[in-house]
């Protein structure tokens, strides 16, 4: 067995195991990722993120869900990657460019006490609304806004958005009372979503103030989802439920999401290092 160094980090409760692969090209099997992510027999996390060198950006974020499947992007994860590379001296730049499965993203680091990163803003790019590019198997290529979706005995309405990964946003009266763990997996694997989908169940709390629960593709319900929060803001604006500068509460904390004049989405939130260690794999 080999010993693997790691750092566990979280962004508003969305926790991943981070592995610095900038010096050695570390690769793990899906089974090893499942073992590491297991909350009873491993470190416990929503997945594993490798920090790698990049030919296109300053660094690369290589992300895997807790079931071992790969994922294009994680908004909370990229904030933690940004904090790691600065706090651990891999870069002195406060605006590094990070390569993801959703493209190159630029981050803006807010430095706090002890010269450590407190907050991170990420330019998440433009939302994708064309069904075939999300992807959603749909009757045409028109934007899917508040369209009917029948799941069991529930007649829901959904808005489809990609923020580099697919999202299905559903507004409900009370997210806390909604059966997320029952309905979430049924929507995740619905036949209209060929690559599966992340599902957000959203309640309006006030003007430009939303509350979100997330069923993540490949991970189940998580305390937070950054790309999901971006998709929620887009869906809220498209359905005239909210504006373009929104506070979104999640079970793990709060994010500020802004739809800028450029058309890009800006996400701002915290990132925190929990502990580091070694694990036998």
Swiss-Prot record:
One of its GO terms (molecular function) is diaminopimelate epimerase activity. The record marks 167, 216 as: Could be important to modulate the pK values of the two catalytic cysteine residues. One of its GO terms (biological process) is lysine biosynthetic process via diaminopimelate. Pathway: Amino-acid biosynthesis; L-lysine biosynthesis via DAP pathway; DL-2,6-diaminopimelate from LL-2,6-diaminopimelate: step 1/1. It catalyses: (2S,6S)-2,6-diaminopimelate = meso-2,6-diaminopimelate. Transmembrane segments: none annotated. Its EC number is 5.1.1.7. The active site is at 74 (proton donor), 225 (proton acceptor). SUPFAM superfamilies: Diaminopimelate epimerase-like. The keyword rRNA processing does not apply. Substrate binds at residues 14, 65, 75-76, 165, 198, 216-217, 226-227. Keywords: Amino-acid biosynthesis, Cytoplasm, Isomerase, Lysine biosynthesis. It is an enzyme of class 5 (isomerase). GO terms for cellular component: cytosol. The keyword Zinc does not apply. It comes from the Bacteria. Pfam families: DAP_epimerase (PF01678). It is found in: Cytoplasm. Homodimer. Belongs to the diaminopimelate epimerase family. NCBIfam families: DapF. Catalyzes the stereoinversion of LL-2,6-diaminopimelate (L,L-DAP) to meso-diaminopimelate (meso-DAP), a precursor of L-lysine and an essential component of the bacterial peptidoglycan. This is Diaminopimelate epimerase. It comes from Leptospira interrogans serogroup Icterohaemorrhagiae serovar Lai (strain 56601).
